[in-house]
């Protein structure tokens, strides 16, 4: 039986918001079965809860943001990605600000945080969203697509006219499992170009950005002293983002995802298109005594 998972203990972290630059206190708490992932703005009076739901996405410019009852939660994708990677279904995320902390720009610190809290199995089967028919969305030359597949596979292709991102390092595929996610995807950082900085600052974006939490490129090279963590870190980060964006569907995906120059907006459009097409997907679970799911999660981490 593949059971739902939550945290064993409450755990806290502090950081800055990538776009707001605000200091933010974050607390992750265990949650009961079928609760799902819910963000809680504890700085508001009264406190407002914002479920991790693709239908609540209102912001897709350089991050994924949710709005519910007037309360915003920005830059959810890296934590959502870590939760998906470790198979966590139920958690309460308390925040003292409208944006999650960026940490080092990857989901690695969130993975460490979740493992430190401990992950426990709950007494109910985990629910998966099984893709039954292809679903595709396009925007110009950008494409995002789901197809039926026995497991969870992600493929992504980026196209940047930059010497540090040659064509041979612009494609990545991953057969999803916790170990593959942690090793191959979780440490890939967000990235940005110096030329875009002015655009971002004019829109009050990237105010908390620095080389401590992003890969920064000028016209020719990577400016970070330590260089890259993977030769194709850029496309790996796009997969990290996609895993987080797709987890807003409300369950773990069983299917194949393909992205070509996709981003937060198109990923969200794909999830909405999928959920709107009742014939294209179904809920499935794997209760005790039935077949094993075609996706491997790590054994629970008892902190």
From Swiss-Prot:
Enzyme class: hydrolase
Co-factor(s): Zn(2+)
Catalytic reaction equation(s): a UDP-3-O-[(3R)-3-hydroxyacyl]-N-acetyl-alpha-D-glucosamine + H2O = a UDP-3-O-[(3R)-3-hydroxyacyl]-alpha-D-glucosamine + acetate
Highest rank taxon of the organism: Bacteria
GO CC entries: membrane
Active site: residue positions: 264
GO BP field: lipid A biosynthetic process
Gene3D superfamilies assigned: lpxc deacetylase, domain 1 (3.30.230.20), lpxc deacetylase, domain 2 (3.30.1700.10)
GO molecular function, one term: UDP-3-O-acyl-N-acetylglucosamine deacetylase activity
Pfam families: LpxC
Protein name: UDP-3-O-acyl-N-acetylglucosamine deacetylase
The species this protein was found in: Xanthomonas campestris pv. campestris (strain ATCC 33913 / DSM 3586 / NCPPB 528 / LMG 568 / P 25)
Gene: lpxC
């Amino acid at each position: 039986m593949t059971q739902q998972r939550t945290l064993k203990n409450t755990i806290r972290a502090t950081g800055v918001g990538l776009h707001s630059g605000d200091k933010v206190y974050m607390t992750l708490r265990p949650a009961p079965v079928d609760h799902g992932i819910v963000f809680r703005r504890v700085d508001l009076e009264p406190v407002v809860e914002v479920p991790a739901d693709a239908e609540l996405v209102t912001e897709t410019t350089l991050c994924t943001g949710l709005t519910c009852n007037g309360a915003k939660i920005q830059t959810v994708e890296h934590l959502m990605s870590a939760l998906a990677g470790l198979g966590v279904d139920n958690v309460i995320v308390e925040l003292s600000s409208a944006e999650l902390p960026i940490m080092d720009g990857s989901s690695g610190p969130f993975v460490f945080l979740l493992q430190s809290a401990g992950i426990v199995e709950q007494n109910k089967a985990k629910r998966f969203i099984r893709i039954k028919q292809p679903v595709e969305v396009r925007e110009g030359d950008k494409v995002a697509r789901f197809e039926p597949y026995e497991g969870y596979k992600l493929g992504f292709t980026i196209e940047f006219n930059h010497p540090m991102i040659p064509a041979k390092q612009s494609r990545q595929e991953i057969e999803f499992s916790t170990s593959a996610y942690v090793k191959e995807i979780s440490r890939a950082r967000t990235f940005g170009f110096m030329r875009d900085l002015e655009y971002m600052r004019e829109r009050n974006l990237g105010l908390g950005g620095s080389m401590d939490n992003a890969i920064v490129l000028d016209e020719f090279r990577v400016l970070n002293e330590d260089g890259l963590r993977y030769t194709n870190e850029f496309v790996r980060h796009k997969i990290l983002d996609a895993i987080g964006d797709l987890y807003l569907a409300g369950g773990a995906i069983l299917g194949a995802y393909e992205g070509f120059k996709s981003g937060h907006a198109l990923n969200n459009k794909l999830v909405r298109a999928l959920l709107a097409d009742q014939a294209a997907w179904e809920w499935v679970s794997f209760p005790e005594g039935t077949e094993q799911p075609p996706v491997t999660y790590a054994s629970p981490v008892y902190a």
